[in-house]
């Protein structure tokens, strides 16, 4: 009997000890509810900001951007540029290892940039690196990158989230499958990827920055429905959610356990029109559609006021952005222009969206109703990431089914070239990049190319203005809004925020 009691006492003591330990050392596990799924964990092969944001769990670049989109050193200590703008010499930090134990050094940088700049690899972000002529490892901590021609925004390319340093041993081991097996120098390493449900990352014990990371794990969970994301925060199923349904922002703000954040962004939302296809090859049709959309009403209906009507094709916070008089809402003028263009009774078309979350659905419904008022019947489709990759990003002009396409773009390099060239340069039609209007203008191409060859701010201003003036006049887009970024998190989560390009910053995140 005494023996049995003693065992019970030990069991009870064990349970109590375990409970005390769990309280003292509770796992710091964070769930992040995001608006759509991920396409790949290879940053060089991802066209969407979300996939690249999640990849920051594992990967780092030579440089990065802070939350004001200012350049910062990461794996690099410093850099110099030759007088002719052709050669970039980068000094690297020492003593850093990849998550598989491989040394981070100049040879690793060369392996990554050689892969990225080789067109034979067919990587979606190849266009960022196509100007690299060669990369040389001068010594273990010195890399020399030689360009084919001067490219004044190149250091911003090295700071882009795509320019991640992947373990060369992992690249050799996994080859084209590297998107499923990320190995970087970042604060977290892959735990589980359930491709239909979540990506879970865990603390990398060998991370090079002392005291980091502070979290034990992060689970990135795609939740397409806005209301469900908000509910997960309120029930404690998630500690961070983005984007937050605008209509629920006020409600969440009243919750004493949740902090709501509305921050400026460089995310421009727009509808591109395929100018190689009728009726969008007619400038009057494109002009008519711009008059047909009531942007201030769209801001209220779909974004609950957390956006501003677009005044250009580049968000105002990007350097060299030009602002114009916003398109007024004038359905009478729209119908007149359609009649002049030969469409007195309107026409039928398709309107696709690059996302299927609730806000995108609202934009589609609102736009569909607005177009109907001027005689245009639009069949709408909200795509998931897989559909978008296959039907939009993966098809060239001849086979593309894109007509009208609602999407968004944030220039993750923080400068004007990446806000313009991927979307308007002739060489950047899909599947190369994201010129979903299939727009082409030789003058625009020339102005954009010349702007990259000069470091003179006045000359850059002139060239970028000239390009934007033409684009605004020819209207391959219906520019809609520049978003404000609305996110929310549990008050006990710190150091986790949204970047202006809609990416995430979480390296020093902690759960109190």
From Swiss-Prot:
One of its GO terms (molecular function) is peptide transmembrane transporter activity. InterPro entries: Peptide/Ni-bd, SBP_5, SBP_5_CS, SBP_5_dom. Disulfide bonds: none annotated. Residues 1-26 form the signal peptide. Part of the ABC transporter complex GsiABCD involved in glutathione import. Binds glutathione. Belongs to the bacterial solute-binding protein 5 family. This is Glutathione-binding protein GsiB. The lineage of its organism: Bacteria, Pseudomonadati, Pseudomonadota, Gammaproteobacteria, Enterobacterales.
């Amino acid at each position: 009997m005494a023996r049995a009691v003693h065992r019970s006492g030990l069991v009870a003591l064990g349970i109590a000890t375990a409970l005390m330990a769990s309280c003292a050392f509770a796992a710091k596990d964070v769930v992040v509810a995001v608006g759509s799924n991920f396409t790949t964990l290879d940053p060089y092969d991802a066209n969407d900001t979300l996939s690249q944001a999640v990849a920051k769990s594992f990967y780092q670049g030579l440089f990065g951007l802070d939350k004001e989109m200012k350049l910062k050193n990461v794996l690099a200590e410093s850099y110099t540029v030759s007088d002719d703008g052709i050669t970039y010499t980068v000094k690297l930090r020492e003593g850093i290892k990849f998550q598989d134990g491989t040394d981070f050094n100049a040879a690793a940088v060369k392996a990554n940039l050689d892969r990225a700049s080789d067109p034979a690899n067919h990587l979606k972000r190849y266009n960022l690196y196509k100007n690299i002529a060669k990369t040389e490892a001068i010594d273990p901590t010195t890399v020399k990158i030689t360009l084919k021609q001067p490219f004044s925004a190149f250091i911003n390319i090295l700071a882009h989230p795509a320019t991640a340093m992947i373990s060369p041993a992992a690249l050799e081991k996994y080859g084209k499958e590297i998107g499923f097996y990320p190995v970087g120098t970042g604060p977290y390493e892959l735990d589980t990827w359930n491709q239909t449900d979540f990506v879970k990352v865990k603390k990398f014990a060998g991370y090079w920055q002392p005291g980091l990371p502070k979290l034990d794990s992060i689970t990135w969970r795609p939740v397409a429905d806005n209301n469900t994301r908000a509910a997960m925060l309120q029930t404690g199923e998630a500690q961070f959610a983005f984007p937050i349904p605008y209509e629920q922002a006020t409600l969440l703000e009243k919750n004493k356990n949740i902090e709501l954040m509305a921050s400026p962004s460089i995310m421009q939302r727009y509808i591109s029109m395929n100018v190689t296809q009728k009726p969008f090859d007619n400038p009057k049709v494109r002009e008519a559609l711009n008059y047909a959309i009531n942007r201030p009403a769209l801001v209220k209906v779909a974004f609950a006021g957390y956006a501003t009507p677009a005044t250009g094709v580049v968000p105002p916070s990007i350097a060299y952005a030009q602002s114009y008089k916003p398109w007024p809402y004038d359905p009478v003028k729209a119908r007149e222009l359609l009649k002049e263009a030969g469409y007195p009774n309107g026409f039928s078309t398709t309107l696709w969206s690059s996302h299927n979350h609730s806000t995108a659905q609202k934009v589609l419904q609102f736009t569909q109703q607005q177009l109907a008022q001027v005689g245009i019947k639009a069949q709408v489709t909200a795509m998931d990431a897989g559909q978008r990759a296959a039907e939009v990003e993966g098809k060239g002009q001849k086979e593309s089914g894109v007509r009208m396409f609602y999407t968004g773009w944030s220039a993750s390099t923080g400068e004007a070239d990446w806000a313009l060239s991927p979307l308007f340069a002739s060489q950047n039609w899909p599947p190369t990049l994201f010129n979903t209007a299939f727009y082409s203008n030789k003058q625009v191409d020339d102005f954009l190319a010349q702007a990259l060859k000069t470091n003179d701010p006045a000359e850059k201003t002139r060239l970028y203005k000239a390009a934007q003036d033409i684009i605004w006049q020819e209207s391959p887009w219906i520019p809609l809004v520049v978003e404000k970024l609305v996110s929310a998190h549990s008050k006990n989560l710190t150091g986790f925020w949204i970047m202006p390009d809609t990416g995430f910053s979480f390296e020093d995140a902690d759960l109190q």
